[in-house]
Amino acid sequence: MRVRPKRSVITLMAIVVVMLILRNQFYSSRTRGHGQEPVISSSQKNLYDGWITPNFYRKGDPLELIVNKVESDLTQLPYAYYDLPFTCPPTMHKKPLHLSLNEIIRGDRKWESDYKLKFGEDNPCETLCARKTTKEGMQTLDKLVREGYVVQWLIDDELPAATTFISTTDHKKYYASGFPLGFIDPDTDKTYLHNHVMLVIRFHASDNDKNTIVGFEVYPRSVSDYHCPGASKNYEQYEIVIPEDENELTYLPFTYSVYWREEFEVDWNHRWDYFLNAGELSDEQSIQFHWMSLANSVGIVLSISFITLIIYVRVMYTDKSNSKSPKYMINIEGIETEDDLDDDKYGKYSVYTVAKDWIQNGRPNLFGLKVLILLVSFGVQFLFTIIGSLTISCSMNKLHNVRNSVLTMAILFFVLGAFMASFVGTRLSMVTKTKRTKANYLDDNRYLKDYKKFSPIFTILCGSSLPGIVMVSTFLLNSIVWAHDSTSALPFKTIVFFMSIYFIVCIPLSLFGGIVANNIPLPQYWLSGITKDESNSDGNGLFVPKSRAKFNPLVYCGIYLCGIFPLLVIYVEMQYVYKSLWLEKTTFYYFYGFLFLSIILLCVLTMEISIIGSYLLMRFCFEDKVVRNNWRWKCFEMGFSGGVYMELYSLYYIFAVLNIHGFSSILISICYSLIFNVMCSLGLGALSYLTASWFINKIYHQKVNL
C-alpha cells in the first residue's frame, strides 16, 4: 500500500510534463515573427485585449513570406511546396520553421522564402528564378494542375495568402485561402502554370508608424516570359508542355510584383472576417440559419423530454401503488394458471418486477459483459475528449486561430481521458460483479473482500485500449500517405512522441484511475438491496415461460430506429464541419459555439431515448429471454445506432459530394471517417447504457426499499 502515493506523484508529474509540452507546441508558432517585439501602448492594449497581440510595422521593415504546401479538395494528399520539382528552391540562408504539433498533423511544411517584401514599398516587377526541371517534373506539374491543387502561403505569422472573389448574394468581398497552381483551358484541355503572382498586401494604420497587416491577396497570372503583366491582359500565357525526350530540360520563369494598400474599414481584430462564411450566405443570414437549426433541435429535444417526463412520473409515482405484480406461475405440466390467462396482463404488468428480474435473474455472457464495459469506457473517454476540448476552446473567444486550440485541447483531453475511462470501467466492473456474485456468498465479509479485488490489466485495458487502437490505425494509414511522399504523413519524431505519451502518460493514468475507483466504496444501497437468496421462491419474482431464445427483428428495428433522432440534431453542424474539413480545405469552421450546443443537445436526446427505449423493452419484451439476458447490450445499442447513421451520411458525403480521385485518397477518407464515427457511436452508446442502467437500477432499488 505504500507504493500508491509514489504512483500518484509519478502520474501527476507526467501530466504536468505533457501539458507543458503541448503548451510549448501550441505557442511556438506564435513567437515567430519578423524578429521585433511590438511595443504596445496602453490605448492599444485596450484595443487588442486578447491572448494574441499584433505585430506592428513601420515603413521599410522587412516582412517574411512563408511558403507552406499545396493541397487539393479532390485528394487527401498535400505536398510540401519546396519538395515539388518545378518550384524555385530556397537559397542557402533560408531555413525551415519550427512546426507545432497542430501544424504537423495538418501536414504543414513551412519555409522561409526568397520573396523580398518591405513594408509600404511597392515593387512592380521582380524575377524570382528560372526553374530548371525535367520531363518527370513537368508531368508532375501537369498532374497537380489537373487535380486542382492550390498553393498555401503565409505572412505575418499566420495570415494566409488568399484568392479574392465577390459574393453573388451580398456583393461583398470574401477570401478563400490559397491560390490555384494553374488552370485548365476548358476548350482545348491544355494546362497552364501560374508562374507570376501579384501580391497585394493590405494594412491598417492604427497609430503613427504603427501599422498592422489585415489582408494578403494573391492574383496569379500565367506568363510565357519574365515580364510582369500588371493589370494588362495582352500577354501570352505559359502552357505546360511535357517534352518527349527524357533528358530534355525545361526552364520555368517565375516573377512577382508587390503592392501595398491601406485598409480603412477592417482592423486587425477583424482581419479573419473575410475568410468566414465564404459568401454563400450573408453574415446575418448564416447566424440566423444556425439559430433556426438550433431551435429545431431544441424543439425535438423538448418533445422527447415531455415523453420522458411522463414515463418517469408514471414509473416512479403512479405505478408505485401497483408495485406488486400478478404472479405468472407455471406448473410441472406447463399448463398456465388462471392469472396467466388474463388478456390484459401486458398492459398491467409492473416494470418493478421486470427490473428485478433483469438485474437478479439475467444470465449475461461474462466475456460479453467485460467487452461491454470496455466499450462503455471507450465511449466515456471520447465524450470527455469532445466536450472538454470544445468547452475550453469556446472559452478562448479572443484567440484568433481557434483551429489550433481545438486540436491541441482534443489531444490533451484524449490523453487525460484515460483516467476517466479506467475509473468508469472499474466502477462498472465492481457493480456488475456485486450483482453477479452476491448470492454465492454466505459470509458478507468474504463477499466484500472479493468484489473489491483489483484487476490492473482490465483497468489498463479500459483506459489505454482506445488510444492504442487509434494510434495503431493512424500509423497504418500513415504508411499509405508516406508511400505517396505527402506532407500529411507523420514524421518519425512525431510518432515517437505519441508513443512516448502513450506509455508514459496513458498507461499510468489508466492504472491510477482504476486504483481511485477501487478505493471508493460502493453506496450502501447497492449492497443492501441485493439479497443473499436471489431465487424467485418467494412468489414475487417473474417466472418466464420456458421458450427457446430466438432473434426478434422488431426489437432490433426499434433499437436502430432510435439513431435517426440524434442525426437530426447534429446534421446541420456535420454539414458545415465536413465542408470545412473535406470539401473546401481552404475555408474555416468557426461555429464552435453552435457545435458545442448541438453536442449537448445530442447527449441529452440520447439519454432521453435510452430511458424511453428501456421502458418500452420492460413493458413489451419482458418474456423475451434474449432481452432479459442482454438488456445491457440493448441499451448500449440504442445510443450506438446514432453513430451508425453518422457513418452512413459520411459515406454518402465521400462518394456523392466530395468527388475524391484516387484509391488511396478514398481509402484514407473512409478509414478516418470510420474511426471517428465509431468513436461517436461508442460515446453515444456509453451515454445510453449509463442512463438506462441508472433508470433500471433506480426502479429496482425503489422497489426494494418499499
Swiss-Prot record:
Its localization reads: Golgi apparatus membrane
| Top-level taxonomic group | Eukaryota
Q: Which Pfam families match?
A: EMP70
Where are its TM segments located? Answer: 291-311, 372-392, 406-426, 457-477, 495-515, 554-574, 593-613, 638-658, 666-686
Pull the Lumenal topological domain ranges from the record. 34-290, 393-405, 478-494, 575-592, 659-665
Q: Which GO terms describe its cellular component?
A: Golgi apparatus; Golgi membrane; membrane
- Membrane topology of this protein: Multi-pass membrane protein
Q: Which residues lie on this side of the membrane: Cytoplasmic?
A: 312-371, 427-456, 516-553, 614-637, 687-706
What keywords would UniProt list here?
Golgi apparatus, Ion transport, Membrane, Signal, Transmembrane, Transmembrane helix, Transport
Leader sequence residues: 1-33
Main localization is Golgi
Q: What does this protein do?
A: With EMP70 and TMN2, plays a critical role in the late stages of a nutrient-controlled pathway notably regulating FLO11 gene expression. Acts downstream of RAS2 and TOR. Essential for cell adhesion and filamentous growth. May play a role as effector of cellular copper homeostasis.
Record-linked PANTHER family: TRANSMEMBRANE 9 SUPERFAMILY MEMBER 4 (PTHR10766:SF55), TRANSMEMBRANE 9 SUPERFAMILY PROTEIN (PTHR10766)
Family recorded in the similarity comment: Belongs to the nonaspanin (TM9SF) (TC 9.A.2) family.
Task: Kindly provide the name given to this protein in its UniProt entry.
Answer: Transmembrane 9 superfamily member 3
Species annotation = Saccharomyces cerevisiae (strain ATCC 204508 / S288c)
